[in-house]
Amino acid sequence: VDLNDKELDDFFKVFDASLYGHERFKEEFKKLVTAYRVFNKIGEHKILSLFLMGDSGVGKTEVARAIHKALGSRTKLAKVNFGNYSSHDALNSLIGSPLGYIGSDGGELLKRIQESDVGLILIDEFEKADSAVVNYFLDVLENGKVVNSQADEYDVNGYIIVFTSNITKENFRSKVSPELRSRFDYKGMFNLLTDTDKKKYVHFRVNQIISKYKEFVSEDIPDGLHDRVVCEVDVSKYKNMRDLNKKIKDTFVKLIGA
C-alpha cells in the first residue's frame, strides 16, 4: 500500500516474471491489489488475503515467493505451516500461552510477523489446523490486528496473507465456515499445467538457470546446453511442478559436468 505508481508497476513486472503461467490469476491479482490500495487508504480494507487451493506442486507457494521477491524483501519469506497446529491446544503455540505457562513469551505467528520486512505471511496447509486456530483468523482478517494470549495487539494493517491448501473445492465449502470464506479476498483453484504448458515452462526455467549461472558462476557453458536440457526432460512423466523442476536442475548439473 506504500508503493507509488511507478513502484507498483515495477512490482507487477517482477511478480509476472517470477510466477510462470497462471495468467488468469495474475490478472485477478492486479485488480485485487489496485482495489486494495484504494480501500486500505480510507480504512475499509485492512488485509489482502488470498486462499489458493490445488494439488501439491501446482504453484500455490510460488505465488507467495513471487510477491516476496517483487516487494524486494531482504529477509526470508515469513511462513507458518498449519500442519503443525492440528492439536486441541495448537492456538497456544501459534500466539503464545497465558502468563505463567510454557510458551507465554510469544508464539510462532508473532515471531514470523516480526521477522517479515515487507508485510507478507504465507500460511501453508491451512486445512490441517485445529478449529480454534482457523477461527482465530476471523478476527485477524476483519480487524487487521494479531492479538497474543496476553492481549497485546500487533498491527498487521497493510499486510498480504497467502493461505495455501490441498483441499478440493467441494471440501472447501464443507470444512471452511461461510464467515471465514467471505473474508478471503480471493479464493481460487490452481490446476496442473498441460504438457504444452510444461514444455514452455522447461524452456523458461532452463533460460532462467543459464542466466543465473552466467551471472554468478561462469560465462563458460557447453554449446547447445539449453536445447540439450530441454530434450532430456520428458514432461509427460511429471505432474508435480516441483518434481519437474528437480529434473531440470539434475539434468543441468549433469550436462555442465559439475
Which stretches of residues belong to each language-model region?
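Conserved C-terminal "switch" segment of AAA+ ATPases
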Residues: 2-4, 18-22, 74-75, 170-238, ...
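Pre-Walker A (pre-P-loop) alpha-helix and adjacent loop at the N terminus of AAA/AAA+ ATPase modules
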Residues: 8-48, 252
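Short loop/turn elements that form and flank the Walker-type P-loop nucleotide-binding site
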Residues: 45-47, 73, 88, 114-117, ...
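Walker A/P-loop
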Residues: 46-80
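The Walker A (P-loop) glycine that initiates the GxxxxGKT/S ATP-binding motif of P-loop NTPases
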Residues: 54, 124-125
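Canonical AAA+ ATPase core
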Residues: 65, 99-104, 125-136, 141-199, ...
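AAA+/P-loop NTPase substrate/partner-engagement loops
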Residues: 70-101
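Hydrophobic positions in the central parallel beta-sheet of the AAA+
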Residues: 80, 121-122
